[in-house]
């Protein structure tokens, strides 16, 4: 069961029979099966402890065997995990930092035997309750910051009428719109209220910003209007619009407003600090690094494009770090470069390379779409494929409404987008590609995945999502937090 990001929780493990040498349990970064190369903090049946997670063990670890009850008490706010044997405190592991989504697991110590365990997460009274700790169930999860994901990110579907129409029913007035035709080959059009909704950039192209008054013509309190352009409103054709809420008005931060080269260029932005999303326009990029993002936390995803000239889309992802980037408009693998400056983003600034020749800081103008993770609403991370139709499960803490995935190790694998509006049940099979103008496809079972109440599950073996041993980055947004979600 995944360790929560806040609160105090307990659960009990009753030790069963085994044929392997040792029982083993503990914390692990892998959402799938534990292996010796994973980052972990484990407690073994002979009393041995080990760790490759940042932190340390304290206390005296007892041995345990069949019939013993191990109580696990996890304090997310204090970043420690206590282990009790039959009600007596044993070892405690204290984390100095949390490098990813923690999981708790139980294992056998080899592939040549088995170890059995019985979990009590609160479905019956605990044998040894720990004062101040709650059972690990959805009722005891903390209240979410965003109780309904559709109030911050929403998906609209419509059928074209060939003239003009207004799309309604969103939970907000959208500030960032990503529109794609489903039933014919049309480009991915990205527009925003910071630049003005008649301006657009196309995610599968390197072309400069365009302007057209018959694509998106207006935004409303709960939607937007489209004109007669065939990429938005051809008669009887199907379309999807993915939308995000930023803010009601632009904020301008002058160059050097916060000190020398902070920021290094004037930044105009709209930011939704609650939902962790902002749109930043830099009309006159400078030969320095710092830019303001308007959010309260370090960004996890930055997608950017030169607006004045032809150039690729450069993407920062926190799982890759600032020394690497990947192009949204191509099937290429991640590349090492200084496109995102000489340091990681902070809670105030993001960084770009210090010259304006190309990429994430090209002269003439830049647009940046920026997100950070919000507990129970958005998640950004990575996973490693296993090449099996029983692929990795990735915990997000919410019912997934929208999912973006990309292989970062191998060239030739496409970006993919799935959402729960186009696929109301599992498996999710209707995919669209940010790096292609192709129409919606269902593909084969090798591309299937499940969008679940607490994450997503890879169901296919395609290289675009599950090559054995290769790394994939993802971005996911919530329909509802896990506390309020129901299975699809």
Regions found by a protein language model. Name each.
Residues 1-8, 16-18, 30-488:
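Surface-exposed molecular-recognition determinants
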């Amino acid at each position: 069961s995944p360790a929560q990001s806040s609160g105090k929780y307990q659960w009990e493990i009753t030790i069963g029979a085994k044929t392997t040498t040792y029982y083993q349990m503990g914390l692990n970064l892998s959402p799938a099966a534990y292996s010796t190369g994973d980052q972990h903090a484990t407690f073994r049946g002979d009393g041995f402890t080990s760790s490759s997670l940042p932190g340390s063990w304290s206390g005296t670890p007892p041995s345990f065997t069949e019939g013993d009850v191990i109580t696990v008490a996890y304090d997310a706010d204090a970043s420690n995990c206590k282990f009790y044997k039959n009600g007596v405190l044993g070892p405690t592991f204290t984390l100095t930092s949390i490098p990813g989504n923690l999981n708790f697991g139980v294992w056998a110590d080899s592939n040549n035997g088995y170890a059995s365990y019985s979990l009590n997460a609160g479905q019956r009274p605990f044998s040894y309750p720990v004062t101040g700790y709650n059972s690990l169930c959805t009722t005891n999860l903390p209240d979410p910051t965003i109780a309904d994901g559709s109030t911050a990110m929403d998906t609209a579907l419509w059928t074209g009428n060939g003239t003009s129409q207004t799309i309604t029913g969103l939970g907000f007035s959208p500030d960032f719109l990503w529109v794609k035709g489903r039933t014919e080959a049309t480009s991915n059009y990205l527009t925003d209220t910071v630049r003005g909704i008649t301006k657009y950039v196309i995610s599968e192209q390197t072309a400069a910003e365009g302007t057209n008054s018959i694509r998106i013509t207006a935004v409303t309190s709960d939607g937007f209007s489209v004109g007669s352009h065939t990429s938005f409103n051809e008669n009887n054709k199907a379309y999807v619009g993915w939308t995000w809420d930023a803010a009601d008005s632009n904020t301008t931060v002058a160059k050097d407003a916060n000190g020398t080269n902070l920021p290094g260029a004037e930044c105009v932005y709209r930011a939704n600090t609650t939902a962790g999303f902002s749109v930043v326009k830099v009309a006159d990029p400078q030969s320095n690094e710092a830019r303001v993002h308007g959010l309260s936390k370090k960004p996890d995803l930055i997608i950017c494009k030169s607006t004045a000239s032809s150039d690729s889309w450069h993407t920062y992802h926190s799982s890759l770090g600032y020394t690497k980037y990947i192009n949204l408009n191509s099937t290429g693998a991640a590349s090492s470069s200084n496109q995102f400056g000489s340091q990681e983003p902070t809670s105030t600034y993001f960084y770009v390379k210090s010259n304006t020749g190309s990429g994430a800081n090209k002269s003439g103008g830049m647009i940046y779409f920026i997100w950070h993770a919000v507990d129970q609403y958005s998640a950004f991370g990575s996973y490693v494929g296993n090449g099996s139709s029983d692929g990795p499960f990735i915990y997000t803490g919410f019912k997934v409404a929208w999912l973006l995935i990309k292989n970062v190790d191998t060239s030739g694998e496409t970006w993919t987008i799935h959402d729960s509006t186009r696929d109301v049940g599992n498996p999710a099979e209707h995919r669209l590609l940010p790096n292609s103008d192709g129409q919606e496809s269902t593909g084969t079972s090798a591309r299937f995945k499940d969008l679940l109440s607490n994450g997503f599950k890879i169901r296919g073996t395609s290289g675009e999502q599950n090559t054995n041993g290769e790394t994939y980055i993802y971005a996911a947004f919530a329909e509802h937090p896990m506390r309020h979600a129901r299975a699809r």
